[in-house]
C-alpha cells in the first residue's frame, strides 16, 4: 500500500487519533471516500477492494476495477460488466451494465450495449431512449428531456452536453447557459 503515512513517515491509517498499521499486501491505495479507501493487489489481473479507516479489509480485492464510493455506493467491474456495491460489499445493483459512472445527485449514468441512459436506484431501472442522454431525478421523473448525443454529470449546477456535434452547458432546469 502506498500513501497512508504519519508525520514520522510510518505507514499508517489515522483513526480516532491513534495510528493503525495497514497490511503491506496491497500494492496501491487511494484516498478515503465515505470512510473507505480503494486498494489494489497486482496479480495476473489487477484486483480492487476496500479497507476502512482502521485498515480492516471490508471488501476483499476481487473486482478488476472499482471507483470510490459516492452516495453510499461504489461502481465495480468484474471483467465483463459493471454494477454497484454498498459499503458492506453487497452487490446492490447487479453487474449488468457495459459502462457505469458514479452517483451524483441521486443519479448514475449507465450504458447497456450501444444505448445510454440514467439509472434510478429508487425505481431500480434505467431510462434509455435511442442512445441519447437526458436527466431524471431520484424518483425516475425526467427533469431534462432526452435530447443529447453526449452528456456529462452535473458539477456545481452545470452539465456539459452535446447536440448536433456542438457542446455547451445546461443548468439544472435544462436551459443553455
Predicted regions: what they are:
Residues 1-177:
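Residue-level detector of conserved, function-critical positions
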Amino acid at each position: 500500500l502506498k500513501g497512508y503515512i504519519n508525520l514520522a513517515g510510518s505507514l499508517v491509517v489515522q483513526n480516532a487519533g491513534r495510528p493503525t498499521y495497514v497490511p503491506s499486501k496491497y500494492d496501491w491505495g487511494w484516498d478515503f471516500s465515505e470512510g473507505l479507501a480503494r486498494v489494489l493487489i497486482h496479480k495476473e489481473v489487477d484486483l480492487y477492494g476496500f479497507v476502512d479507516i482502521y485498515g480492516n479489509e471490508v471488501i476483499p480485492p476481487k473486482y478488476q476495477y472499482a471507483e470510490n464510493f459516492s452516495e453510499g455506493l461504489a461502481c465495480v467491474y468484474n471483467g465483463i460488466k459493471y454494477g454497484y456495491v454498498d459499503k458492506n460489499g453487497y452487490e446492490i445493483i447487479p453487474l449488468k451494465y457495459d459502462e457505469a459512472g458514479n452517483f451524483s445527485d441521486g443519479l448514475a449514468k449507465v450504458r447497456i450495449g450501444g444505448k445510454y441512459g440514467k439509472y434510478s436506484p429508487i425505481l431500480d431501472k434505467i431510462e434509455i431512449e435511442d442512445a441519447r442522454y437526458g436527466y431524471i431525478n431520484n424518483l425516475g421523473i425526467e427533469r431534462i428531456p432526452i435530447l443529447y448525443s453526449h452528456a456529462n454529470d452535473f458539477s456545481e449546477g452545470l452539465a456539459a452536453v452535446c447536440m448536433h456535434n456542438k457542446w455547451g452547458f445546461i443548468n439544472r432546469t435544462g436551459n443553455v447557459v
